[in-house]
Amino acid sequence: MPTNWKDSGLRWYWVVVLVFVADQLSKQWVLSNFELYESIQLLPIFNFTYVRNYGAAFSFLSDAGGWQRWLFTFVAVGFSVVLSVWLRQQPSKMWRLNLAYTLVIGGALGNLIDRLQHGFVVDFLDFYWNTSHFPAFNIADSAICVGAALIILDSFVTGKDDKKTDGIKE
């Protein structure tokens, strides 16, 4: 385990700040410039559309009556704490895993602030084909998905790297 924060994955916490600030600024821009459900087409397959998400990914539990706000708040805080502890235990040179953890933390905190401040998450990135729309999402959601994908990728790549070095004396 690293002896100080500069040698640990905590050195990567600037990514948390970057994701959080970008997410919050983009959502504030949407709240200041869009009415609910207002949409502006940017590309033939992409809109900015302001929607409110009272649930989780893909509006999971969005109409559950309000208790889900506190469940998702607890989950976001829990994951952020656990991943921060893991960051502290990781060497700073393990870039893929450190980047993954900080992306997830930044995204979780971005959506957490929305839930606490508004009671919902502001979503606005709307991809579609013809009349079929992918569920709207935001920068925080993107960071969480990329972070989760990197965690999965790291489990495969790290496993292969470990097998390559088995039996090799340094």
Swiss-Prot record:
Record EC number: 3.4.23.36
Where does the chain cross the membrane? 12-32, 67-87, 94-116, 133-153
The topology of this chain with respect to the membrane is: Multi-pass membrane protein
Recorded catalytic reaction(s): these are: Release of signal peptides from bacterial membrane prolipoproteins. Hydrolyzes -Xaa-Yaa-Zaa-|-(S,diacylglyceryl)Cys-, in which Xaa is hydrophobic (preferably Leu), and Yaa (Ala or Ser) and Zaa (Gly or Ala) have small, neutral side chains
Places the protein is found:
Cell inner membrane
For this protein, the record's PROSITE patterns field holds:
SPASE_II (PS00855)
Q: Which keywords label this protein?
A: Aspartyl protease, Cell inner membrane, Cell membrane, Hydrolase, Membrane, Protease, Transmembrane, Transmembrane helix
Q: In which pathway does it act?
A: Protein modification; lipoprotein biosynthesis (signal peptide cleavage)
Q: Does the keyword Nucleotidyltransferase apply?
A: no
Q: Extract the coiled-coil ranges from the record.
A: none
Q: Where is the active site?
A: D123, D141
The entry's cellular-component GO terms read: plasma membrane
Q: Which GO terms describe its biological process?
A: proteolysis
Recorded hits in InterPro entries, A to Z, give: Peptidase_A8
Q: Which GO terms describe its molecular function?
A: aspartic-type endopeptidase activity
Task: Decide whether keyword Transmembrane helix is in the record.
Answer: yes
What family, per the record?
Belongs to the peptidase A8 family.
Q: What does this protein do?
A: This protein specifically catalyzes the removal of signal peptides from prolipoproteins.
Name-wise, this protein is Lipoprotein signal peptidase
Gene source species: Shewanella halifaxensis (strain HAW-EB4)
